[in-house]
């Protein structure tokens, strides 16, 4: 049987979700962008094929639904240790303050430095993952984190705590950005929102319930127990990742069917018969390999040079930093105003944790539904437009294709599909945070504090799912680098707000602080209207500029289809 015959037979079993929203007679209008002239990640901005490569009869990804779900579990497991390391520390903040005889501001610095390194590291390591592959960078990250946690568990002074918190954050934080890259490697736009939502949802379990875990461990065995817990857990994660995590970077493995050359990128799971059969490792699709790119440490700056991306990152960053400031304030207030024990403080994070988990997973599922619905309507509309143009130009297909390719009016509005519900969620969370601030300021009953915290958390992190999914859509081959920029914004803004929290409370009280933060966040959300109105045109113009600078005719070249 020839390779062509085998390919035809394989395509008879392509999953329905990998065909949904596609139409081989039309051309995609995804607002994807390249961050440099030589980047091969430009999408074919005018192909109706949302989910497959340019090569006929070859699926975009060989990973089955079950294998994608296993990747979700793998990403969530590693991502959990990145998110939990921040929140698990909150219940012992006042204990650290007393243990090392430091001020509240110095205790907050241990959180600030964590966020600084959590923001900076992914911007660097994400670029390495986009070049050398996801697997080796993830393994290095877990190993560095594992060593830092052991050091923290054995620390004897404040300086050691501070330095090792920096290493801990720098080590593990890149996995959040890399996880987005992994999902971009193996999923299509029509299904991506759900998978990204699942990964983000399970990752946020660490943030949502870390304080509860930390309170339970520290109240039973002392503050060092939280770091021993992280060391043991990350050690187990390192073993499983070494054995089971496959490489997904499309420059190295294509659609998953190509065996990577370097042993660092090869997992033992590739030797399992069922995996070899599903991925077609014995009958690969080398044509799906994307061109290799060199390491570009300036890639984040190129992404940050894009106006609409800056707006999106600012909005998401301000929202996340308000949420993390609320967590820090909750810890301090429950300990010093409400005089609760460490164990009870942990329990008080449960309502916000459940709300956060619910919101992120629900947001991902909503994005899938929204994308499919809008894409179906768009498909009908563009077919009608093509028929009208064919009549107008008397059946000149080339003329019609050129007109559609060169006019943004006919482009699918991916920005609107991903961001249209964001304004409502941002507004509701701002109301919740304002109410939370005044509740703790006047010391209302604890139930009111926890209810406002839960309400604000229910809507505050939706923007992370929306923005992460859109960023992966726009930069499928640089997803780790692009998502690292999101981490940079949200973590550095969090560091600034938390560092200033004590001083702001002295001047404005908690009510004034959260009214101020909510006002900034809700004001920034007005920029969403600019994105929703102009995002499609801005992305379209940027693609034209990049194509012209590379000497290509817009939409008429064999560029890679955005996933």
Swiss-Prot record:
The keyword Cell membrane applies. Residues 1-50 are annotated as: Disordered. Residues 97-108, 157-165, 217-224, 318-341, 443-445, 503-511 are extracellular. GO terms for biological process: ascospore wall assembly; transmembrane transport. It is found in: Cell membrane. PROSITE patterns: MFS. Keywords: Cell membrane, Membrane, Transmembrane, Transmembrane helix, Transport. Residues 1-10 have a biased composition (Polar residues). Residues 23-33 have a biased composition (Low complexity). Residues 39-49 have a biased composition (Basic and acidic residues). The chain crosses the membrane at residues 76-96, 109-129, 136-156, 166-186, 196-216, 225-245, 297-317, 342-362, 422-442, 446-466, 482-502, 512-532. Residues 1-75, 130-135, 187-195, 246-296, 363-421, 467-481, 533-563 are cytoplasmic. Pfam families: MFS_1. Belongs to the major facilitator superfamily. CAR1 family. This is Quinidine resistance protein 1. It comes from Saccharomyces cerevisiae (strain ATCC 204508 / S288c) (Baker's yeast). The gene is QDR1.
């Amino acid at each position: 049987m020839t390779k062509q015959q085998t390919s035809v037979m394989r395509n008879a079993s392509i999953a329905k979700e990998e065909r949904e929203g596609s139409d081989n007679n039309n051309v995609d209008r995804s607002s994807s962008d390249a961050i440099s002239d030589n980047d091969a990640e430009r999408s074919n901005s005018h192909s109706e094929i949302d989910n497959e490569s340019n090569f006929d009869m070859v699926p975009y990804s060989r990973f089955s639904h079950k294998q994608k779900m296993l990747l979700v579990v793998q990403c969530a497991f590693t991502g959990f240790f990145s998110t939990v390391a921040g929140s698990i520390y909150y219940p012992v903040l006042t204990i650290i303050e007393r243990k090392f005889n430091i001020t509240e501001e110095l205790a907050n610095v241990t959180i600030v430095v964590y966020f600084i390194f959590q923001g900076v590291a992914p911007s660097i390591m994400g670029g390495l993952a986009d070049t050398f592959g996801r697997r080796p960078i993830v393994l290095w990250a877990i190993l560095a984190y594992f060593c830092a946690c052991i050091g923290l568990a054995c620390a004897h002074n404040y300086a050691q705590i501070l330095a090792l918190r920096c290493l801990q954050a720098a080590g593990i934080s890149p996995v959040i950005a890399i996880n987005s890259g992994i999902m971009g490697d193996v999923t299509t736009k029509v299904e991506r929102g759900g998978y990204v939502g699942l990964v983000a949802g399970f990752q946020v379990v660490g943030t949502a319930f870390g304080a509860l875990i930390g309170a339970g461990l520290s109240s039973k065995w002392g503050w060092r127990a939280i770091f021993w817990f992280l060391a043991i857990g990350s050690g187990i994660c390192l073993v499983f990742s070494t054995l089971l995590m496959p490489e997904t970077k499309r420059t190295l493995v294509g659609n998953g069917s190509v065996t990577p050359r370097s042993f660092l990128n090869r997992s033992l799971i590739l030797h399992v018969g069922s995996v070899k059969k599903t991925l077609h490792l014995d009958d690969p699709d080398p044509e799906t390999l994307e061109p290799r790119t060199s390491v570009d440490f300036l890639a984040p700056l190129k992404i940050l040079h894009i106006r609409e991306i800056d707006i999106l990152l600012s909005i998401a960053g301000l929202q996340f930093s308000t949420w993390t400031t609320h967590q820090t304030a909750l810890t301090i207030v429950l300990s010093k105003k409400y005089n609760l024990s460490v164990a009870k403080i942990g329990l008080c994070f449960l309502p916000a944790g459940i709300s956060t988990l619910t919101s992120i997973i629900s947001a991902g599922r909503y994005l899938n539904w929204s994308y499919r619905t809008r894409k179906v309507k768009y498909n009908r509309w563009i077919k009608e437009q093509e028929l009208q143009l064919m009549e107008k130009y008397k059946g000149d297909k080339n003329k019609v294709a050129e007109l559609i390719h060169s006019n943004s009016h006919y482009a699918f509005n991916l920005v609107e599909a991903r961001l249209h519900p964001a304004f409502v969620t941002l507004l509701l969370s701002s109301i919740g945070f304002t109410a939370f601030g005044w509740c703790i300021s006047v010391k209302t009953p604890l139930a009111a504090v926890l209810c406002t915290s839960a309400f604000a958390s229910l809507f505050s992190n939706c923007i992370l799912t929306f923005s992460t999914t859109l960023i992966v859509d726009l930069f499928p081959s640089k997803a780790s680098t692009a998502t690292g920029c999101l981490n940079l914004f949200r973590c550095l803004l969090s560091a600034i707000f938390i560092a200033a929290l004590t001083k702001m409370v002295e001047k404005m009280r908690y009510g004034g602080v959260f009214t101020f933060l909510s006002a900034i966040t809700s004001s920034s959300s007005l920029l969403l209207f600019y994105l929703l109105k102009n995002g499609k045109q801005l992305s379209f113009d940027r693609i034209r500029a990049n194509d012209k600078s590379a000497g290509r005719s817009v939409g008429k070249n064999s560029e890679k289809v955005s996933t």
